[in-house]
UniProtKB/Swiss-Prot annotation:
The gene is glpB. One of its GO terms (cellular component) is glycerol-3-phosphate dehydrogenase (FAD) complex. Conversion of glycerol 3-phosphate to dihydroxyacetone. Uses fumarate or nitrate as electron acceptor. This is Anaerobic glycerol-3-phosphate dehydrogenase subunit B. It catalyses: a quinone + sn-glycerol 3-phosphate = dihydroxyacetone phosphate + a quinol. Its EC number is 1.1.5.3. Belongs to the anaerobic G-3-P dehydrogenase subunit B family. Keywords: Flavoprotein, FMN, Oxidoreductase. HAMAP family: Glycerol3P_GlpB. Pathway: Polyol metabolism; glycerol degradation via glycerol kinase pathway; glycerone phosphate from sn-glycerol 3-phosphate (anaerobic route): step 1/1. It comes from the Bacteria. It comes from Salmonella agona (strain SL483).
Length: 419
């Protein structure tokens, strides 16, 4: 099977790269093994929250300039501040075109409220998520009886420290009792599958309506809206106060929805989606990828003009840690890592950990190297890249988006030259 591009990995980076390549008229396939890290995320995307020296970032342009000085090997630093901003804006447009109407400004970070009621600087958030400063003084944090994925009293306690009048309440929906037989099934995603049924909407409205008359804003867990935000908008139009949603413990309704919106858009535009499959081997000839062999297609290889590695980091097995070191398991690409295992980590758990910055070695076009030689038609994007700490620096989603679009533009340019 011949394709212009085969993307190995169906997470945020892989999907955005595929969508951008489709804009250039290229035929793409995505091979994906299972759920991506988006399923376990908040659904918000960070661009750059903190510099390596610990300074918080609010002005993104100034932050990117400082990052270039402090971390010259960071994926952003390789592109330059203006290029990063341009690609980030393109990514936001691409997300909106896919139905993910995310709120945010590429030039200025905003602060969203987290499930614990604290504030986190971010780039893009779902419109349901409350952002600081809140537009209300009297707030009620509402939990769902029996839901262990969200603790209303913890969020309320944090918000009270910000001089807000915050109460807590709990709603009990007997219609959810069918999920209570097994506590592990009473999770936000399963509740959403039930509440998203339009017949159940009035039940949720009836439960929230008495609470809404005594406050200016309701904050509750995101336990509905798996496909879209229609129910949230329906409730906001009818309740006498604002309704906002906080992401829960994984799996996350907002994260799954974002992934599904991108995946459906990719398929709608003619992309080939290969779920439940796994790349077992990649054949390289004369420094280029010639064939990709997957588990489900056995002896039928995929033959791409270009290939993209978007396999993720340790969480997605895009990188594997062994006693001897860190390796990239599909091709055995060169990996940037510390010389000894003892240098992988810091003693204090909450300190920035060196292993977070491990990843494949690439050139400035994000083409990785194998035994010191660049693989000419292969690009590495997203969390598999080296040189950044997505947790400490708050840049995971941004690096995925920016590197994906940079690789897509580079591939499209080269594909046009080869025609």
């Amino acid at each position: 099977m011949k394709f212009d591009t085969v993307i190995m990995g169906g997470g945020l980076a892989g999907l955005l790269c595929g969508l951008q390549l489709q804009q250039h008229g290229l035929r793409c396939a995505i091979v994906t093994r299972g759920q991506s890290a988006l399923h376990f995320s908040s659904g918000s995307l960070d661009l750059l929250s903190t510099l390596p020296d610990g300074q918080p970032v609010t002005d993104i342009t100034a932050g990117l300039d400082a990052l270039c000085r402090q971390a010259p090997e960071h994926p952003y630093s390789r592109l330059g501040a203006q290029k990063v901003l341009t690609l980030a804006q393109q990514a936001q447009t691409l997300l909106n075109a896919s139905g993910a109407q995310l709120y945010g400004d590429v030039q200025q970070a905003h602060q969203r409220v987290t499930p614990l009621g604290t504030l986190r600087s971010t780039w893009l958030s779902s419109p349901e998520v409350p952002v600081w400063p809140l537009s209300a003084q009297r707030i009620c944090v509402v939990g769902v009886s029996g839901l262990l994925d969200f603790q209303a009293h913890l969020a309320a306690a944090s918000l009270r420290q910000r001089d807000l009048n915050v109460e807590t309440a709990e709603i009990d929906l007997p219609e959810l009792d069918v999920l209570r037989d097994n506590p592990t099934e009473f999770r936000a995603v399963n509740i959403a599958r039930l509440l998203d049924n339009e017949e159940k909407w009035p039940l949720l409205y009836d439960a929230l309506s008495p609470i809404a008359t005594n406050c200016d804003m309701i904050i509750m867990p995101a336990c509905f809206g798996l496909a879209n935000d229609t129910l949230w908008r329906w409730l906001n139009e009818r309740l006498p106060c604002a309704l906002t949603l906080l992401p829960t413990l994984p799996p996350s309704v907002l994260g799954i929805r974002l992934h599904n919106q991108l995946q459906r858009q990719f398929v709608r535009q003619g992309g080939i989606w290969m779920p439940g499959d796994e790349v077992k081997k990649v054949t390289c000839r004369r420094g280029t990828v010639s064939e990709i062999w997957t588990r489900n297609h056995a002896d039928i290889p995929l033959r791409p003009r270009f290939a993209v590695l978007a396999s993720g980091s340790f969480f997605s097995s895009g990188l594997v840690a062994e006693r001897e070191g860190i390796r990239e398991p599909i091709l055995g690409l060169d990996v940037q890592q510390t010389a000894t295992r003892a240098e992988w980590y810091q003693q204090h758990f909450f300190d920035p950990q060196p292993w977070q910055q491990f990843g494949v070695v690439t050139d400035d076009a994000f083409r990785p190297s194998l035994a010191g030689n660049t693989v000419e038609n292969l690009y590495a994007i997203g969390s598999v890249l080296a040189g950044f700490d997505p947790i400490a620096e708050g840049c995971g989603g941004g690096v995925c988006a920016v590197s994906a679009l940079q690789a897509a533009h580079h591939i499209a340019e080269r594909a046009g030259e080869q025609q």
